[in-house]
Structure formats: C-alpha cells, structure tokens
Amino acid sequence: MSEYIRNQILGIADNFKALASMAGDIEQVARICTDTLKAGNKIMFCGNGGSAADSQHLAAELVGRYKLNRPAMNALALTVDTSILTAVGNDYGYETVFSRQLEGVGRPGDLLVGLSTSGNSRNIVLAMELARRMGVRTVALTGRGGGEMKEVAEFCIAVPSDATNNIQEMHIAVGHLVCELVEREIYGG
C-alpha cells in the first residue's frame, strides 16, 4: 500500500509540473477577476458535485480572506441556496439552475466562473451562453481539453488531466493562486 500511495503522490506532482506551464493563463484569470472587482462588479461561481464545493470554497476565500486581512470582496457561489436550486430544478429543469439565478443577479461587467471537470456540464454551458448575451464575462475551469465550455467561455483554463480527482486538485490550486494574486493586486501584500 505504501508504494501505491507514493506513486499517487508522484503522479499528483507530475500534474502540478504540467500545470506550471499554464502560469500565463492563471495570471490572465487573476487579471480578469481583479478588473471585475475593481470596477465594482461581482464574481459568481458555479459547478456541480465536487465542483460545487470548490465554487463555494473559492467564493469564501474572496468574501472572507485568503491570506490578507482585508475588506470582503464581492463574490458568491450559485450553488448554495437549496430552495432556489430545487425550485428552479423542479419547475424549469436542472439544466437551468445557474442560468435562472444569473438572470436575476447578474449585471453587465460581472464575472461568471464555471468549474467542470469535463467541461460539458449543460447547466454551466447554458449559464455561460446567457452570461455572454447579458454582458457578463465568463471564465471556465475545466479538464479533459475544455469540452463545450471552452467554446462558450471568454477564457478557459483546461488543466492537464483526464482524471476527475486530479482535475479538482488543480482547480483548487488555480483558484488559490488567483485569490492570492487578486488580494495582492487590490490590497497589496
């Protein structure tokens, strides 16, 4: 079992070495997030399953703090209100749970960040299509080459893996780097 654990950890390290080649893309996402917040707009996150949890995690880093003690930043996860999710899912279909919320709270200049390991989550694709029509910017965090989200998002980081768990690990690493860069750019440090 120790050998298996060692090999898994080395595989994770290899994934992160490959992710390092995407530093410029990560910097671009941080710039988009920083510009959004500096303009007085908000960042909205969405995802399904583990990516829903990651969406909440990243919104919390911005509203709470990542490393710096500073004022709250305007961010939210569209994955947290069970009454909205179940009402919209029941009445309109699960594929609309994010786009319906975006229609209500999104404003031109806001940013929608969609997380999906496959890049093909229909509810996120539909939300991104609506976002573009509304003047809401879009960033996709995916794996597996980007999927359909790569085609509809303004900017896509497709992390270099096809394994769901490894994609999610890299999404959190990318998200943490973005949070740190945004904090530093807006509040110094």
UniProtKB/Swiss-Prot annotation:
Q: Name the reaction it catalyses.
A: 2 D-sedoheptulose 7-phosphate = D-glycero-alpha-D-manno-heptose 7-phosphate + D-glycero-beta-D-manno-heptose 7-phosphate
Which InterPro entries does this UniProt record tie to the protein?
GmhA/DiaA (IPR035461), Phosphoheptose_Isoase (IPR004515), SIS_dom (IPR001347), SIS_dom_sf (IPR046348), SIS_GmhA/DiaA_subfam (IPR050099)
Question: Binding positions for Zn(2+)?
Answer: H57, E61, Q168, H176
Cofactor(s) demanded: Zn(2+)
Q: Enumerate the GO terms in the molecular function aspect.
A: carbohydrate derivative binding; D-sedoheptulose 7-phosphate isomerase activity; zinc ion binding
Key words of the record? Carbohydrate metabolism, Cytoplasm, Isomerase, Metal-binding, Zinc
Please name the PROSITE patterns in this protein's record: SIS
Q: Which GO terms describe its biological process?
A: carbohydrate metabolic process; D-glycero-D-manno-heptose 7-phosphate biosynthetic process
The protein's superkingdom reads Bacteria
- UniProt-listed Enzyme Commission number(s): 5.3.1.28
Places the protein is found: Cytoplasm
Pathway(s) served:
Carbohydrate biosynthesis; D-glycero-D-manno-heptose 7-phosphate biosynthesis; D-glycero-alpha-D-manno-heptose 7-phosphate and D-glycero-beta-D-manno-heptose 7-phosphate from sedoheptulose 7-phosphate: step 1/1
Q: Which GO terms describe its cellular component?
A: cytoplasm
Q: Matching Pfam families, A to Z?
A: SIS_2
Q: Where is the SIS domain?
A: 33-189
**Which residues does substrate bind?**
N48, G49, G50, E61, N90, D91, S116, T117, S118, S121, Q168
Transmembrane regions: none
Please report which protein family the annotation says this sequence is part of. Belongs to the SIS family. GmhA subfamily.
Q: What does this protein do?
A: Catalyzes the isomerization of sedoheptulose 7-phosphate in D-glycero-D-manno-heptose 7-phosphate.
Put simply, this protein is called: Phosphoheptose isomerase
Which organism does this record belong to?
A: Akkermansia muciniphila (strain ATCC BAA-835 / DSM 22959 / JCM 33894 / BCRC 81048 / CCUG 64013 / CIP 107961 / Muc)
Task: From the UniProt record, report the name of the gene that encodes this protein.
Answer: gmhA
